[in-house]
């Protein structure tokens, strides 16, 4: 006989240490440790938390701007690499599953980065990663486009886990691809949750997919820690506003504004089954005879050499 389970969800709302991946990694390890001490089963961080969202991306072009971009790319994180090894160790020691936004450095060129959502198990293993499919507006000054290899759910002891970055929730089809795989716990990684659109899209996805949504919003550095050439106004929207949403679209924890904190909620899987039994858009509430949807999850290497070798470093 199947039984409903209980799960403790957590969102780490904190600012990274900009342009310092080692210090940011140590801060993340501390937050993972704290989550473990509080009995959290799944911990979410915001979009590109390691090593930070490029909040100055809309600034006018200048030498300082270009220098910041170069430093940003140089602080990208290899997957796998020393930083992810350290995060895996922390997750294993704390017994916590982790979903963390990462500025992922492409190992092939060493000069391109992705907006990546990295999934780590409580056993200390990398479950997978999802590279943002379409960077939004001026984010394209920084991030490359990802493919669909990571558009999948992960079987965990408490249920099925998935995640998307920011306005991927607006694209609809990526979210449906995850709903069709039966997602039950979904991480919505945002640079912030301050806009009404962020909350609207996150609550809508929770209701449509019938899953819990961990909305992880980011914080920027303190005004006194701003890099040269960047105005304080750039930080106005990085106020966090992280929250946790139930399968009926109701906010059950948070939001919290402008404060470093760990937001938690103890939830039951019963709400997932009650919601999906009514309208399961990836199952009985769909019409595959009318609509056909195909996702190409094959890898897209940048280079295939004539001798047959594939440059799979990226």
Swiss-Prot record:
Superkingdom classification of source: Bacteria
Active-site residues, Swiss-Prot/TrEMBL: 47, 132, 166
Family matches, as Pfam families: CN_hydrolase
EC number of the protein: 3.5.5.1
Alphabetical list of Gene3D superfamilies matching this protein: Carbon-nitrogen hydrolase
Catalysed reactions listed for this entry: a nitrile + 2 H2O = a carboxylate + NH4(+)
Keyword DNA-binding: no
Top-level EC class as recorded in UniProt: hydrolase
UniProt entry keywords in alphabetical sequence: Hydrolase
Domain CN hydrolase: from-to ranges: 7-269
GO terms, molecular function: nitrilase activity
InterPro entries the UniProt entry points to: C-N_Hydrolase, C-N_Hydrolase_sf, Nitrilase/CN_hydratase_CS, Nitrilases_CHs
Function, in words: Nitrilases catalyze the mild hydrolytic conversion of organonitriles directly to the corresponding carboxylic acids. Catalyzes the production of aryllactic acid derivatives. Mediates the hydrolysis of cyanohydrin to (S)-phenyllactic acid.
Family: Belongs to the carbon-nitrogen hydrolase superfamily. Nitrilase family.
The protein's name: Nitrilase 2
Species in which this protein is naturally found: Unknown prokaryotic organism
Organism ancestry: Bacteria, environmental samples
């Amino acid at each position: 006989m199947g039984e409903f389970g209980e799960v403790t969800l957590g969102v780490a709302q904190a600012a990274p240490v900009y342009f310092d991946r080692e210090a940011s990694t140590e801060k993340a390890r501390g937050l993972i440790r704290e989550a473990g001490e509080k009995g959290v089963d799944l911990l979410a961080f915001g979009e590109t938390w390691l090593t930070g969202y490029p909040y100055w991306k809309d600034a006018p072009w200048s030498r300082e701007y270009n220098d910041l971009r170069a430093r940003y790319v140089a602080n990208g994180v290899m997957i796998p690499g020393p930083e992810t090894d350290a995060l895996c160790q922390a997750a294993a020691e704390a017994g916590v599953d982790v979903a963390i936004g990462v500025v992922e450095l492409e190992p092939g060129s060493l000069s391109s980065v992705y907006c990546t959502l990295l999934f780590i198990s409580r056993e200390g293993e990398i479950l997978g990663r999802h590279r943002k499919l379409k960077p939004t507006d001026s984010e394209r000054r920084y991030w490359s486009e990802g493919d669909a290899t990571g558009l999948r759910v992960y079987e965990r002891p408490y249920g099925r886990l998935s995640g998307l970055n920011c306005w991927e929730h607006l694209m609809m089809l990526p979210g449906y691809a995850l709903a069709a795989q039966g997602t039950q716990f979904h991480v919505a990684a945002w640079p912030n949750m301050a806009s009404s659109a962020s909350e609207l899209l996150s609550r809508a996805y929770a209701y449509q997919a019938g899953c819990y949504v961990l909305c992880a919003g980011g914080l920027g550095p303190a005004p006194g820690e701003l890099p040269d050439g960047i105005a304080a106004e750039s930080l106005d929207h990085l106020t966090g506003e992280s929250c946790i949403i139930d399968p009926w679209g109701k906010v059950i924890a948070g939001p919290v504004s402008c404060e470093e904190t760990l937001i938690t909620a103890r939830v039951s899987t019963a709400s997932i089954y009650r919601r999906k039994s009514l309208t399961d858009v990836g199952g009985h509430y769909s019409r595959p005879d009318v609509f056909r949807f195909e996702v190409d999850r094959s890898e897209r290497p940048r280079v295939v050499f004539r001798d047959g070798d594939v440059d799979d470093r990226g």
